[in-house]
Amino acid sequence: MLDAERAGAGASPEDVGEAGAGDAPTLPIALGGETGASAALKIGSAIAPAVLLAACGGGGGGSTPTPTASTPVVVTPAAITATQASRFLAQTTMGATRAMIDTVISRRYEGWIDDQFALPRATSHWDWLNANGYNVAANINSETGFDATMWRQMIVEPDQLRQRIGMALLDMLVVGIGGVNLNWKQFATAAYVDVLLDNAFGNYRTLMGAITTNAAMGSFLTFLGNRKANASTGAQPDENYARELMQLFTLGLYQLNMDGSVKTNGGTPLETYGPADVSGLARVFTGLSLASNVNTTPDRYRQPLVMNASINETGSATFLGTTVSGGGTAAVDKALDTIFAHPNIAPFVSKQLIQRLVTSNPSPAYVGRVASVFANNGSGTRGDLKAVIKAILLDTEARSDDALTGTTAGKLREPVMRLTAWARLAKINSASNAWAFGDTSSQSTRLAQSMGRSGSVFNFFRPGYAPPATGISNAGLVAPEFQITNEQSVVAYVNYMQGLVANGTGDMKPDYSDLTAKASDSAALVDEINLVLAAGQLSSATVTAIRAAVDSVATNATNAATNRVGIALLLTLASPDFLTQR
């Protein structure tokens, strides 16, 4: 956790204790004397907050000195260690595996990234839903199948960098299935996620066009079938998409320098746009409609929206200092070109991608280096996401071991990423293709997050969120993922993972064969879990505590290997060291 993040997330002093920024996290253990996997993994709700929030006392907000070069500072160590490889994979995949660690060591960082760029998508979400029979009349008003295809791709598909970037984009360019007011909504939302994944290594301008003509986005942000102004009734075009496209997807509320800092005039932030810009841009996004009226199959939700001239505004529209006229797709293209050319887009998008992959509080120099690559990939191309991804992941602030000790480095690991990290370690699969994790967005029983299920365009957490009245906010830092972190969600997470670690769910049973082979040696067992699951970030105190818990189960006890592995896994998953991605 960021040292400043140790102020907690809405926890009272009684919950978080007295731990300071320099204190090692404590791992209270109350496993009881029962035998069997489930019994050995019992951690009650009273313990969970202590496990996860014990290290959330006050903390300072210092900073780590960073290079000020205007171009990315690439770290190329003579040899990559297994720990460094695992840390890299924590930023670039949905979870490390032993095999991938070895591949990164062999191919090195940039070689591994290039290999991932070259991988085709094995199966689209849309095609998987079709192949598994979800395109039947019984599912016309259903979400059935959506969660299954999402979990499957995140956990087992080999294009792990694409999956990670796609989920980062879904956190930024939000569509949630519950707000998609279409039939066949599982197909419509799957088609949207496919757009993000298909364009994850493309150009951001192309991606802007693809989401603008996507049916699920059109429904979610209410511009599908948006009508031009009606002089008789006074009705005006829906402004939702025009506003969120600028505010959340491209530019932000305030004018930015290339390093992401806000431009001011006399101390007052300069706004990027005003109400007139929103109204003008909304006139452009009229007329976009479904390509077909056939609703007996989901096919029309995969097709790009088309222009319905009868409801499209063909008069002039002024926004961001530009005026377009004539309507149609030409006006849409010019509007998107205008936004894409705005100086804000490079730092705005770059900073959010850094936050999703590497650290919640990147230095201005880091943001500036990545933004410069967004603005120009070195060959005159703007918005080249491959170049931006490399700039983020190969920068010294991402790769240097110094980041491990910086007081503002790192981020709270998203709940979904915690589950997928365990699932990939445990070789989770579903022979039936049911992928029974389902919707995990419940704060009281699951993860408080489920990809593609945000209830709002503002996502489960905002990029600028800081827990109020904490060391984080006092230090001027942010911790987005803390917006869904509280006593209830912490307990729910530990309890949910307890069941999964012990038993899996449905036909998804964990394969711990690699770990049970080490179960009799607590040092070897915890070292392996520390490396693959936690990227070597468990402190010596945490390792000692987990080993003690493991050794409380005698090696000759009933189900000893299973119980020892389960204890080590659950306590790692519950430790602040794992919950922090550095």
Regions found by a protein language model. Give the residues of each.
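Sec-dependent bacterial lipoprotein signal peptides
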Residues: 1-9, 14, 18, 25-54
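N-terminal mature-domain "stem" immediately C-terminal to a signal peptide or N-terminal signal-anchor/transmembrane
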Residues: 74-122
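Flexible, low-complexity segments enriched for small/polar residues
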Residues: 86, 90-93, 134, 173, ...
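Amphipathic interfacial helices
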Residues: 145-146, 156-164
